[in-house]
């Protein structure tokens, strides 16, 4: 389908850490990631970093909270959701979103009719304001 959300990778650190301001400050640091994510791939590009992979984002965030990691790299909505659910007491996101990844609704290859119907519904929701309401509800911020 047409994209309904644009995401990207972001860095999360302990709330009181002012030494890491973004991705460029991660050289030589301990980075926690979620297995099989683009964040795990990106962390592998950091020079002299010790990257530890976890089964889920909560475990990676706990590693940060417990002092076993200096930072977590994951998709922006994943980390922002973690912060909204109480993680903001201990952590914060820093720096700019590192890349751009569009989210869409997958349909079976060749099912052009369904894809067109989905795209039409998305366009209608954007036109009538429903998309903006849902975006704010589920992503916790205004569409930029």
Question: Model-found features: residue ranges?
Answer:
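Short, Asp-centered acidic motifs that coordinate Mg2+ and/or phosphate
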Residues: 30, 70-71, 104
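Flexible hinge/capping segments at coil-to-helix
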Residues: 14-30
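Short helix-initiation/N-cap motifs at beta->coil->alpha
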Residues: 18, 35-38, 52-66, 100-101
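Beta->alpha turn/N-cap motifs
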Residues: 14, 34-37, 56-57, 73-83, ...
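Short helices/loops that flank or line small-molecule/ion binding pockets
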Residues: 24-25, 45-46, 58-77, 85
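Periplasmic-binding protein-like
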Residues: 5-13, 80-122, 139-144
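Ligand-binding clefts/hinges and TM-proximal coupling segments of bilobed small-molecule sensing domains
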Residues: 38-52, 91-94, 117-144
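Hydrophobic residues within well-ordered alpha-helices
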Residues: 26, 64-65, 105, 118
């Amino acid at each position: 389908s047409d994209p309904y959300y644009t995401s990207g990778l972001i860095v999360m650190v302990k709330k009181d850490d002012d030494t890491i301001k973004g991705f460029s400050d991660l050289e030589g640091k301990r980075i926690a990631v979620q297995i099989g994510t683009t964040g795990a791939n990106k962390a592998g590009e950091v020079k002299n970093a010790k990257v530890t992979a976890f089964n889920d984002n909560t475990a990676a965030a706990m590693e940060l909270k417990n002092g076993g990691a200096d930072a977590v790299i994951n998709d922006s909505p994943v980390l922002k959701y973690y912060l909204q659910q109480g993680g903001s007491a201990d952590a914060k996101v820093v720096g700019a979103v590192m890349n751009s990844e569009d989210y869409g609704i997958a349909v079976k290859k060749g099912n052009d009719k369904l894809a067109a119907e989905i795209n039409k519904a998305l366009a209608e929701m954007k036109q009538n304001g429903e998309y903006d309401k849902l975006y704010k509800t589920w992503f916790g911020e205004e569409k930029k």
